[in-house]
């Protein structure tokens, strides 16, 4: 029981890092920033014990890249004589994410004795499925929505204005990008991790999570479709099913996948016909598919907006080479 509670606590830490939010009583500080400060403390403490603070070559390369990116943005702003330094301080954001990530890995290592990609993927999968469930509960039950909105500050007024699903820290494109990453990680585990491939219950759990995140995640943010398509492509390429031959090692995977696919399709059709909440959200999630079936055009309102007001290309050679030095305040009408 104590181990289960510890795993739930780590899941909360992972969620606070991956989907940061603020509490209404102190909206200036979000969970990612709090974890980053904790991470700095842990790094200093660990450094004092070991008498050194070391970085891997891969991490050092990422740190250098962050500083180079910030410097380029500074040059662009200075050269164009603007006072827009939105991305000049990117390295601060980088170290904030890095500090929070250290806490997550530290917590996982404390409980499991190691911090591996498979363990991290397991926690991220649980967190993403939980966020999807929370989003449905918030959308369907006003009392629960009021409870969340009372204690959590995450700009929910805008989400409600545009009628978008949201969880606790999970909303709009940032959530879609993070859902996409987890879908890819799940596909990787299903194809490459022998412990997962040999355990029927693990295959079933990860496939169920894949379907839940793919469907409800798209209801929250259609950017999730990117991860869905890449995840499917990874499954197809890694298992070799495009050759119309299923290898013995992947037979369990595809047998469970086929059963779940049929189940989710039947359930989806039933809810589409009988549940107005599901009807509205599923049509938003897969608007491109419904438009293609009903009108023959593969388009969405989002892609129309991208093509008209959001894809802004440089108008001269200087803009292509050094940029305009303008990033923030939607100067290019990106909303």
Stretches found by the model and what they are:
Residues 1-9, 51-66, 116-124, 200-205:
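Membrane-interfacial loop-to-transmembrane alpha-helix junctions, especially the N-terminal start
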Residues 1-50, 71-77:
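N-terminal signal-anchor transmembrane segment
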Residues 28-46, 91-100, 176-184, 226-233:
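Membrane-embedded alpha-helical segments of multi-pass membrane proteins
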Residues 62-68, 81-109, 119-123, 128:
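Aromatic-anchored transmembrane helix interface
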Residues 118-149, 170-220, 224-241:
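Alpha-helical transmembrane segments of multi-pass inner-membrane proteins
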Residues 139, 236-294, 314-315:
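A membrane-periplasm/extracellular boundary helix in multi-pass inner-membrane enzymes
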Residues 143-164, 328-335:
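Interfacial juxtamembrane loops and adjacent helix segments
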Residues 161-164, 278-332:
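Membrane-interface loop/short-helix elements at transmembrane-helix boundaries
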């Amino acid at each position: 029981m104590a181990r289960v509670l510890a795993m739930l606590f780590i899941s909360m830490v992972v969620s606070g890092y991956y989907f940061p939010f603020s509490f209404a009583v102190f909206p200036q500080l979000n969970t990612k920033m709090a974890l980053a400060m904790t991470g700095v403390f842990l790094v200093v403490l660990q450094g004092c014990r070991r008498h050194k603070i070391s970085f891997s070559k891969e991490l050092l390369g990422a740190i250098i890249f962050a500083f180079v990116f910030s410097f380029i943005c500074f040059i662009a702003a200075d050269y164009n004589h603007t006072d827009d330094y939105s991305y000049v301080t990117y390295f601060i954001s980088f170290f904030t994410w890095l500090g929070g990530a250290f806490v997550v890995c530290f917590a996982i290592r404390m409980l499991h004795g190691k911090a591996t990609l498979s363990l991290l993927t397991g926690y991220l999968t649980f967190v993403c499925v939980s966020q999807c469930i929370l989003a449905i509960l918030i959308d369907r039950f006003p009392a629960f929505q009021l409870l969340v909105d009372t204690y959590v500050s995450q700009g929910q007024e805008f989400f409600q204005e545009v009628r978008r699903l949201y969880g606790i820290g999970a909303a709009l494109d940032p959530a879609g990008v993070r859902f996409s990453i987890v879908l890819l990680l799940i596909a990787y585990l299903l194809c490459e991790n022998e412990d997962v491939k040999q355990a029927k219950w693990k295959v079933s759990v990860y496939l169920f999570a894949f379907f839940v995140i793919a469907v409800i995640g798209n209801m929250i943010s259609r950017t999730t479709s990117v991860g869905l398509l890449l995840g499917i492509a990874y499954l197809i390429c890694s298992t070799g099913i495009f050759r119309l031959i299923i290898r013995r090692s992947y037979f369990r995977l595809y047998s469970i996948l086929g059963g779940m696919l049929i189940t989710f399709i039947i359930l989806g059709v039933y809810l589409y016909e009988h549940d107005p909440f599901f009807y509205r959200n599923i049509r938003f999630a897969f608007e491109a598919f419904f438009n293609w079936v009903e009108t023959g055009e593969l388009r969405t309102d989002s892609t129309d907006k991208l093509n008209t007001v959001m894809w802004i290309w440089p108008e001269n050679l200087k803009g292509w080479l050094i940029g305009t030095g303008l990033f923030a305040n939607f100067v290019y009408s990106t909303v």
